[in-house]
């Protein structure tokens, strides 16, 4: 329908993919440009959740099966299904109840009059579409910086654990360690805190410049700074970096020599054609048909068989820091 409408306006398009629509926004004016902006807004993944809700609702008016036990392949974490409730947009609107009642009553003219962006309103109202059964309530919570805590604990990074025993300002403390600045000088809006935060999120599992870029680092630092950020974070976290290499060595020893190695609180070994990693909880991660391979950089690495990013059974190449990610996320799941 939209293509037909554009044809009536004298504009022929082969595709309405995001890139094509963005180009039309730049190169058109008036109602065409406005329509393309609306198209972009309505294609937001969060708004599409309403369609998922409609598809998933059962005869009793409720949605069932939103969480799959042990849904994640290698870590065993719970997996979101159907509506993906693990990543619902946050609420920031002050008059959320008013917006909800207007949409519920179908008074979209007032929504357009009172709010700048109808799609943004719909996005914020997604959480309010979930209603607990009578006599029950939803409690929404999570563990604060759980992966940073678990990684610091497993790797024995003393200052990280000390910070979590106290104020828990891991991003500020990371920036303080990276840039040798007193933590009291690093406020929430500080550019140093922003650097500490993005480095903490991007570098914990061996990430380098590419990981920083994917986390949005170029929004506030120059590209030439990225290598220095990676090095500063690794210098500030020597035990975590060493943990990557210890796990890497243990995994290779298990595959090549069938050797059992204890690395801190985890045990790595080979059994019945599988690489095994025993977690502090006693649960064991298993990697099918592991073998030594040469990676794309020409270095020796371990690969195993599993479901790849293409959702097909394939051979997956891995390395120490990636195994650490599995270990940390699985341990966090056990918590």
What are these regions (language model features)?
Residues 209, 236, 240-241:
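Active-site-proximal binding-pocket segments
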Residues 179-200, 215, 322-323:
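Active-site-adjacent structural elements in folded domains
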Residues 1-186, 243-335:
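Acidic, glycine-rich two-metal-ion catalytic cores of nucleic acid-processing enzymes
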Residues 2, 6, 39, 197, ...:
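Short amphipathic alpha-helical coiled-coil/interface segments
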Residues 142-143, 209-212, 229-232, 335:
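Catalytic palm active-site di-aspartate
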Residues 1-8, 174, 178, 194-211:
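Core structural elements
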């Amino acid at each position: 329908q939209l293509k037909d409408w554009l044809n009536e306006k004298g504009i022929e398009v082969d595709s309405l993919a995001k890139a094509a629509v963005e180009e039309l926004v730049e190169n058109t004016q008036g109602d065409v440009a406005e329509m393309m902006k609306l198209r972009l807004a309505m294609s937001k993944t969060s708004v599409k959740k309403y369609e998922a809700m409609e598809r998933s609702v059962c005869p009793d008016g409720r949605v069932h099966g939103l969480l799959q036990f042990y849904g994640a392949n290698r870590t065993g974490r719970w997996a979101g299904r159907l509506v993906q409730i693990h990543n619902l947009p946050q609420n920031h609107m002050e008059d959320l109840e008013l917006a909800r009642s207007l949409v519920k009553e179908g008074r979209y003219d007032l929504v357009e009059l009172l709010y700048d962006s109808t799609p943004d309103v719909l996005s914020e109202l997604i959480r309010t579409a979930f209603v607990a059964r009578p006599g029950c309530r939803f409690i929404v919570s999570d563990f604060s910086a759980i992966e940073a805590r678990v990684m610091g604990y497993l790797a024995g990074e003393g200052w990280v654990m000390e910070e979590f025993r106290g104020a828990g300002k891991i991003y500020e403390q990371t920036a303080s360690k990276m840039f040798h600045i007193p933590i009291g000088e690093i406020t929430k809006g500080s550019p140093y805190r922003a650097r500490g935060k993005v480095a903490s999120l991007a570098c914990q599992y061996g990430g380098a410049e590419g990981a920083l870029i994917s986390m949005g680092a170029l929004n506030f630092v120059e590209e030439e700074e990225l290598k220095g950020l990676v090095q500063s974070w690794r210098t500030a976290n020597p035990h975590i970096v060493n943990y990557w290499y210890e796990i890497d060595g243990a995994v290779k020893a298990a595959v090549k020599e069938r050797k059992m190695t204890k690395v801190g609180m985890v045990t790595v070994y080979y059994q019945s054609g599988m690489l095994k990693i025993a977690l502090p909880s006693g649960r064991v991660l298993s990697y099918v048909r592991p073998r030594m391979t040469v990676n794309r950089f020409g270095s020796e690495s371990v690969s195993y068989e599993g479901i790849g990013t293409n959702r097909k059974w394939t051979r997956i190449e891995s390395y120490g820091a990636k195994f650490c990610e599995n270990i940390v996320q699985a341990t966090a799941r056990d918590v």
